[in-house]
Amino acid sequence: MGKTTAEKIFASHLVDEPFSGTKVLRLDVVMCHEITTPIAIADLMARGKDRVFDPTKIKAVIDHVTPSKDSKTATQAKMLRDWARRHAIKDFFDVGHNGVCHALFPEKGYIRPGYTVIMGDSHTCTHGAFGAFAAGVGTTDLEVGILKGVCAFREPKSIRINLNGTLPKGVYAKDVILYVIGQLGVNGATDRVMEFRGPVVDAMTMESRMTLCNMAIEAGGTSGICMPDMVTVEYLWPFIENEYPSKEAALAEFSTWRSDDDAVYERVLDFDVSVLEPIVTFGYKPDQVKPISEIAGSPVDQVYLGSCTNGRLEDLRIAARILKGKKIAPSVRGILSPATPKIYKDAMAEGLIDIFMEAGFCVTNPTCGACLGMSNGVLAEGEVCASTTNRNFMGRMGKGGMVHLMSPATSAATAIEGVIADPRKYL
């Protein structure tokens, strides 16, 4: 019987199986940021275990509130900064070099097919786009990962999600994943690996695949996974070209991590994306979604473009194409947060930042701040934000605020009209 990608990764990284169905895995990468890691650091220090298993396998960044907005966030940042220096963690990114973790670390080439990756952040599932097993963990698991380089997981069960057809005009990876979450529900993939397959995924860029995998957690998934292919090789080639004689050789190795044709899945779901419209959330759960035709015209106060879901260069290009030569509605605040310094620089070089600023957007440094209502775009009570982020929980972007999740294209059209708007008329 064949194996899924997740099963192959578990088998190759297995260290121990202390209980039936529980597997302890060796970790390839442990990621850290300043919101959750200081709690783990403090506990390890209190226990007299201020050590790291391998400083070369730890990647750390200050990204959620940066630069620090007050004494509390400055203290959190300092704790991570001091810890990284104390343990000679080379891959630490401080103010001026930092970006949103789930965009920055792939951009640096840190994730490879077949890797095991953890972080004290639920959207760690993003990195499954590379054919890795990547999962968010709690403080205790993060501590063990930092100290010993292992983590315990339940036996993986995978749901295969076949995305068939062709993406219509104005429909993007964000619309697809919102639709899938709407079909599954927020608990529909709990403790499962969501394996994204089919011609639609095959045709996607790595950026779009990361958008898909990023929101696996919104359906309860432990991780999202895409099959490594030549798209993966091309993305990683600048980092691996000295390791392989050719791209074909890299592809041959990467392909060993692909699910076998006779792999067994808990469920197999088929979706035809050809019939999709742009999708928007309407309530306080990510599975509360509507096609644009049923929600267009709803007013918003703010439009936010950015985050680990949609703050990449591809996303900025999509939005800028719609915004070029136009102004955002006077009733709306537009905020753009490019996800990394490189994305910011590349967007500047392409003239995208000029387009956003001329349209009336405020452009911030790379940060997660607005997404979780901590800085650079917090909502007031009663305000509504059209956002390219991944969570629309009550108060997520500010106490008493409401969030409509949507694609960069839909958010750009919404900014122009001041109400939720169909981007297809601008394409």
Swiss-Prot record:
Protein name per UniProt: 3-isopropylmalate dehydratase large subunit
Cofactor or coenzyme needed: [4Fe-4S] cluster
Enzyme Commission no: 4.2.1.33
Cofactor note: Binds 1 [4Fe-4S] cluster per subunit.
Any GO MF annotation of the entry: 4 iron, 4 sulfur cluster binding
Metabolic or biological pathway, per its Swiss-Prot or TrEMBL entry: Amino-acid biosynthesis; L-leucine biosynthesis; L-leucine from 3-methyl-2-oxobutanoate: step 2/4
Top EC group: lyase
Keyword Protein biosynthesis: no
The organism's taxonomic lineage, starting at the top: Bacteria, Pseudomonadati, Thermodesulfobacteriota, Desulfuromonadia, Geobacterales
